[in-house]
A protein has these predicted regions:
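Short intrinsically disordered, low-complexity coil segments enriched in acidic
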Residues: 1-7, 200
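Hydrophobic faces of well-ordered beta-strands that scaffold small-molecule active sites
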Residues: 2-4, 23-25, 56-59, 79-81
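Conserved active-site-proximal phosphate/metal-binding subdomains
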Residues: 35-41, 45-57, 63-213
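Glycine/Thr-rich beta-alpha phosphate-binding loop at enzyme active sites
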Residues: 5-45, 88, 92-94
Length: 213
């Protein structure tokens, strides 16, 4: 099965024509590269659902039952979670970084490489702030190459030093408040999604009397 990441409807349509089995449609909230259109998932997901016929997974800003229910309502078949799974017991990253994700809020990420038209959403730290400042001064990639080196980013996850390098994290950090096991997380999301659909949202379903009328 081939699932292709897309950050725009046009890219999703191209992937569909090329024969992929499904797409991951990534809204602007996502960690890593959100594309250059800056369209949030609330708009991008239904826009893609209106035109794309193959299965679609919603990505970017998802981490709980509310996000899952919203994604289904917007036209996706499910959700993809990146930053949320980083903060789980099974995640191989350092415990200090998991706790940093829990401590961060939705404003914590920085956008780097904006001036280079290769935007990336990363966790805000001393290095990301330095990169942003250099970009404002007209820096080119060569000027920040050492700061954003992959080896430095890997050391963040291995050593647990938040400021050791650049590391990706999405805006969903603002809704992450614990470090559960993957099993606990999935069961919680499914249970709470069912409660939302059959509880709070059930109030919007027509009654038998209304249907008969």
């Amino acid at each position: 099965i081939v699932i292709h990441k897309c950050t725009s409807v046009r890219h999703g349509l191209s992937a569909e024509r090329m024969g992929v089995d499904a797409i991951s449609i990534d809204g602007f909230e996502c960690a890593g590269h959100p594309g250059e259109d800056d369209v949030p998932g609330l708009i991008l997901i239904p826009a893609a659902a209106d035109k794309i016929k193959i299965p679609m997974i919603a990505s970017g800003g998802f981490g709980d039952a509310r996000g899952l229910v919203a994604a289904l309502a917007l036209g996706a078949e499910g959700i993809n979670m990146g930053t949320r799974f980083m903060a789980t017991k099974e995640s191989p990253i350092h415990e200090a970084i998991k706790q940093q994700i829990v401590a961060n809020d939705e404003r914590a990420p920085d956008l780097i490489f904006r001036t280079m038209h290769n935007t990336s959403r990363v966790a805000r730290n001393a290095v990301s702030q330095q990169v942003v400042a250099l970009e404002r001064q007209g820096a080119k990639f060569e000027d920040v190459r050492e700061l954003v080196a992959g080896v430095r980013g890997r050391s963040v996850y291995e050593v647990g030093d938040n400021d050791a390098g650049i590391w990706s994290a999405g805006q969903i950090q603002g809704l992450i408040r614990d470090v559960p096991s993957c099993e606990e997380l999935i069961h919680r999301i499914v249970r709470e999604a069912e409660e939302l659909i059959h509880g709070r949202l059930a109030r919007f379903a027509p009654t038998k009397q209304a249907v008969q009328a």
